[in-house]
Amino acid sequence: MSIYRLSPSPNFGVGEVMYESWEDGFTPEECERIIQYGESLCPENSVVGSDDESQEVAEQIRKSKNSWIELNKDTEWIYDRLGNILRCMNGMHWRFDIHGFHEHLQYTVYHDDKSFYRWHVDNMMMSDMPPRKLSMSVQLTDPADYEGGELQINDGTIHTVANDRGIVTVFPSYILHRVTPVTRGTRRSLVAVSYTHLTLPTSHNV
C-alpha cells in the first residue's frame, strides 16, 4: 500500500476546535477531475469494519459506493494538496503527532436512493494499522445538484458542516459524525485519514 508521509506541522497556536473547514481547497475544475478519476475506478458497495476486523456490506449502517484512489503520478497533486492543508490545520488547532496517510484516498458516492452513513467514528483500532488521528472530507459536488447528504458532527450538539464545492473539512477521527440520507441527486466526496507512528518505508514527503 502506498504511504504518503508528512513532515511535522507548524505550530500556529490558534487553539483546538471540534472541526474546521478550509474554503476553496479545490476548484470546481479540480473537483471534476477527481470525480472523473474516481468514477473510472468503478465504485463498489461500501463496507464497514467490525470488532473482529472483518469487513462487510451493511446497508443498515452505511449505504454508498466507493473506490480507492492510490498515490501515483496522476494523483500526486491531490495528496500534495490535502497534505499541505492538513499540516496547516493541524498546526493551527490540534498539533497532533501526524506522520501521514496510510490508506488510499476514498472516493465516495451517495445516490438518491437515500444513501447515507449513520453515526460513527473513524478511529477504530486495527491490529495492523497505526492510530488514526485526523479525518478529512472534501466536498466534490455542487450543493445545488443534490438534497440531503449533509455531513454532520456531534459533540452533544449536532453541527451541519458547510458544503460549498471544493471545501475541505478536518476533524479528529474520534469525533462522532454522519452523512444524512440523500433524497435528490448525487453527492460525491473524497475522504482521507491521517495516522501517527508509521513504521513502513516512506514513498513521499511534503
Where are these regions (language model features)?
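Fe(II)/2-oxoglutarate oxygenase catalytic core
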Residues: 1-168, 174-198
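Single conserved hydrophobic/aromatic residue that forms the stacking wall/gate
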Residues: 197-206
